[in-house]
């Protein structure tokens, strides 16, 4: 290989130079244009879609159909396009038709009140009503102190309750609340203790009662007065809030339950409600917002107060001081947590915006209210606002009214002659309305097309009849004495006639055969130092070894002596030479021992025995 053909050294090579601008321009020119689908005609642009009212959700649904880009100039055949081709040719027309169909649905058709089922709780008014979030059960409480659990899966056409409970003895049930998973039922009554029940209706915990002699509400561990309302956090199944006449709202957590005391020993947070003069006011109702960011309370002075969840709860974040002229009976958030409904004793229903607490958005007057538990609320999608009215006399019926949330115009009404309607629940999953009345009955409204499960499975379930009294049974005569085993066999005298004696004798014989005499088996031999609590030999355990060393081996010689006097006298010489106690003290002062012979001569000269000094008679 010559020098001309030899490879060049690295030092002689030149670095390559890249033109970034040219490369970027070439990349842009070669990149595929994906702004518009190639199978959509050019006449339909993005601007036309926005003008026609196509929502972002519709565009996102089309983008979910993943397919490669088609080559330019490609046209689909009419047979291949199918029904989707008409959609591509005129999206504006299809969207307009869908919009018109939505507008055609009236608000009345959104209320599931085509059918009705009637359930009896008792003879007293319904004071509490709540459906669990899964929609399998619901609970009702009344002025008769009872809580009744209704299970849709177990009920038939009789509409009978599943369980009847008396959780608070002689206290009125004020409020009920189910946990988001339906495992726990919280009962608020006329006492200061909140009861927690499981699915079977058994109480597994309760809250501690506070000290009513302590003024500071932060120091007391629990409520000191009647609990008016309880509500679970929609985002936390272990947290719930309660309000009481002691002027406080308290946050509790199920994780604080103590197994030993079977009690929640202390609250997590305390929220104080104060009036315009700074004094304590009693909250009557409390609730969480659906997104869990707000806690609201309605007080007996007519004020609506709300706090942001997780704050210090010192200052109120939302306050309407004169929301109503009387006590507030119910408050409810809208599904978007931006509006608030309030119902008061001033016979009004008001809607508030969380952005503007000065003036209500809408006001509805003339709604009779005679119960402190009259509910109000939104439908699951906020198309309707509902509330109940009371019946002041037999001529004026109580009603369940539905209003337009934009104007508060009455769109639907259900009358109850001479009966008040105050407890109302609209379950979002079942799409059924449950109303509690003042006569102790519960009315469930549903629609066969819009509603699902719930009471619909009960109205079609046949009623089971009690047939115990209709069964014809064959009577049997039992005469055991006629059997051969009880016949007399060679007995003489009265034994032939005493039949009871023969029965007892036979039973004793059978009993002895069935129960043989118990014999304790012999112990198995021990292989080792110990087994089954037994020691093989003395000294096999630490206790035996110590006892042997301290007691037996040390006193072996002493135990051998049978003559006690001789064993003591053998130490006499040593004690005389080396005294330890008394003799050592008298060695110098009294070297010669002098013993007392007698104190006083006895009167009886014949008695030569000496008597103790303390027994000698006194001499004159």
From Swiss-Prot:
Segments for region (Disordered): 28-99, 593-620
The organism's place on the tree of life at top rank: Eukaryota
One record GO biological process: regulation of mitotic cell cycle
Compositional bias per record (Low complexity), positions renumbered to this chain: 43-59
Biased composition (Polar residues): 75-87
Any Pfam family the entry gives: WD40
Start-end of each WD repeat: 121-160, 168-207, 222-262, 278-317, 323-362, 415-455
Record SUPFAM superfamilies: WD40 repeat-like
GO cellular component: nucleus; site of double-strand break
InterPro entries: WD40/YVTN_repeat-like_dom_sf, WD40_repeat_dom_sf, WD40_rpt, WD_repeat_GAD-1
Gene3D superfamilies: YVTN repeat-like/Quinoprotein amine dehydrogenase (2.130.10.10)
UniProt keyword annotations, A-Z: Developmental protein, Repeat, WD repeat
Outcome recorded upon mutating residue 324 to N: In ct226; temperature-sensitive
Acidic residues: bias regions: 600-610
Coiled coil spans: none
Family label: Belongs to the WD repeat GAD-1 family.
Function of the molecule: Required for initiation of gastrulation.
Name of this chain's protein: Gastrulation defective protein 1
Native species: Caenorhabditis elegans
Gene (UniProt): gad-1
């Amino acid at each position: 290989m010559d020098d001309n053909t030899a490879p060049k050294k690295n030092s002689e090579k030149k670095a390559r130079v890249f033109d970034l601008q040219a490369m970027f321009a070439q990349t842009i020119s070669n990149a595929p244009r994906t702004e518009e689908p190639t199978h959509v005609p050019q006449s339909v642009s993005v601007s036309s879609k926005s003008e026609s009212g196509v929502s972002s959700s519709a565009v996102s649904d089309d983008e979910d159909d993943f397919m490669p880009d088609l080559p330019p100039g490609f046209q689909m055949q009419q047979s291949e396009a199918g029904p989707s081709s008409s959609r591509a040719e005129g999206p504006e027309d299809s969207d307009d038709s869908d919009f018109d169909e939505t507008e055609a649905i009236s608000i009345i058709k959104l209320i599931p009140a085509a059918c009705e089922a009637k359930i009896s709780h008792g003879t007293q008014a319904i004071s509490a009503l709540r459906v669990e979030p899964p929609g399998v059960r619901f609970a009702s409480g009344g002025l008769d102190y009872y809580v009744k659990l209704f299970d849709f899966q177990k009920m038939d056409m009789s509409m009978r309750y599943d369980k009847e409970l008396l959780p608070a003895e002689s206290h009125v049930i004020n409020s009920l609340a189910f946990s988001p998973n339906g495992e726990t039922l919280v009962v608020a009554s006329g006492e200061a203790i909140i009861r927690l029940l499981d699915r079977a209706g058994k109480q597994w915990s309760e809250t501690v009662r506070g000290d009513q002699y302590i003024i500071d509400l932060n120091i007391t561990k629990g409520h000191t007065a009647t609990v008016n309302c309880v509500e679970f956090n929609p985002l936390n199944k272990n947290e719930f809030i309660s309000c009481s006449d002691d002027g406080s709202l308290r946050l509790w957590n199920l994780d604080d339950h103590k197994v030993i005391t079977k009690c929640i020993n202390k609250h997590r947070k305390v929220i104080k409600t104060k009036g315009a003069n700074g004094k304590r006011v009693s909250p009557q109702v409390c609730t969480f917002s659906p997104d869990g960011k707000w806690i609201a309370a309605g007080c007996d002075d007519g004020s609506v107060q709300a706090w942001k969840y997780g704050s210090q709860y010192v200052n109120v974040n939302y306050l309407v001081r004169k929301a109503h002229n009387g006590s507030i009976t119910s408050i409810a958030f809208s599904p978007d947590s931006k509006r608030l409904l309030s119902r008061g004793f001033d016979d009004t229903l008001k809607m508030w915006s969380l952005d503007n607490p000065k003036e209500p958005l809408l006001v509805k007057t003339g709604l009779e209210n005679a119960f402190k538990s009259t509910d109000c609320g939104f439908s699951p999608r906020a198309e309707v606002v509902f509330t109940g009215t009371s019946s002041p006399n037999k001529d004026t019926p109580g009603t369940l009214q539905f209003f337009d949330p934009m104007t508060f115009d009455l769109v639907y009404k259900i009358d109850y002659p001479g009966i008040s309607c105050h407890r109302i629940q609209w379950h979002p999953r079942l799409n059924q309305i449950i109303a509690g009345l003042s006569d102790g009955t519960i009315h469930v409204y549903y629609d066969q097309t819009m509603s699902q499960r719930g009471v619909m499975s009960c109205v079609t379930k046949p009623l089971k009849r009690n047939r115990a009294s209709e069964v014809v049974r064959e009577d049997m005569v039992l005469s055991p004495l006629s059997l051969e085993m009880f016949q007399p066999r060679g007995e003489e005298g009265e034994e032939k006639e005493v039949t009871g004696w023969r029965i007892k004798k036979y039973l004793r014989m059978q009993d002895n055969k069935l129960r043989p005499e118990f014999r304790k088996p012999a112990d198995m031999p021990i292989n080792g130092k110990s087994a089954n609590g037994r020691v093989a030999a003395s000294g096999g355990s630490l206790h035996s070894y110590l006892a042997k060393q301290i007691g037996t081996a040390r006193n072996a010689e002493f135990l051998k002596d049978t003559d006690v006097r001789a064993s003591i006298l053998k130490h006499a010489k040593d004690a005389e030479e080396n005294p330890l106690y008394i003799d050592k003290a008298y060695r110098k002062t009294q070297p010669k021992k002098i013993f007392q012979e007698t104190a006083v001569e006895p009167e009886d000269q014949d008695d030569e025995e000496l008597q103790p000094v303390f027994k000698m008679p006194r001499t004159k």
